[in-house]
Amino acid sequence: RLTDTFRVIGVDLRGHGGSDPPPSRAGLRYEPMAADVLAVLDALGIEEFSAVGESLGGGVSAVVDELRPGAMRRLVCCEGIAFDATAFPRGASPGEGGASGNFMADIARARRAVWPDREAVRARYAGRPPFDVVAPEALAGYLRWGFVDRPDGQVELACDPETEAAIFEVTSEPGGADRAFAHLAAMRGRVAVLRGEASYLPEPWFRAQADAAGTELRTIPGGHFFLQEDTARAEAIVRAELGR
């Protein structure tokens, strides 16, 4: 939908999609992930670009700008994981609590990794949050790229549960979401901050992002994955925010 105007590049961050997980937990911090993005852009000969970053991608995109000042024209940060943990009282920051101290990590570790086939995944996921509200083409894309084929004929999550759990933990530690948040002030005038109206993440988190970046907070109908809930709306958002 956007290729008439943009050269669209999608990067699988470490441990996601076709990218291998790093050998150590430290490799899941934002800086090495951002360095990977720059390595891809260098390999493609791209010197200037705009970014649309959702969730983890929003936070990592801010660090991409930090590592290479002047290369990123604009960032559309959608429910970005970029926050100053000290701004929230204990228990208010998403991720706290649970047996490991991070309930999102606990959920990730309990996630079923291996399924008989993609249709079995579809049957299970389509009626459960958050996939019960995403567009059919978004779910189809996740089934295609979010799972890998196994030699035994089954399919397995491309981002294994332990890697996903470690990412949730690392984002709340130094070098994670705080690193991205600290750079937002340097991006004033070049960032759009968007949140989902029904997001499970707190509105003050994103208002703090917008304040740091010197912009207005824009609230979009939908949840954390509002981009995937309505493809036509997502296209319109990107075109409007990037001015094309």
Which residue ranges define each predicted feature?
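Helix-rich cap/lid subdomain of alpha/beta-hydrolase
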Residues: 85-158, 172-174
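Active-site loop/oxyanion-hole signature of alpha/beta-hydrolase fold enzymes
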Residues: 3, 9-52, 56, 88, ...
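Catalytic histidine neighborhood in serine/cysteine hydrolases
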Residues: 211-224
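Structural signature of beta-strand start/N-cap positions in the alpha/beta core
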Residues: 5-7, 47-50, 71-74, 190-192, ...
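Alpha/beta-hydrolase active-site loop signature
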Residues: 13-17, 82, 223-226
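Conserved serine/cysteine hydrolase catalytic core
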Residues: 137, 147-210
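Catalytic histidine-centered segment of alpha/beta-hydrolase-like enzymes
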Residues: 222-231, 235
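Conserved hydrolase catalytic core segment
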Residues: 47-92
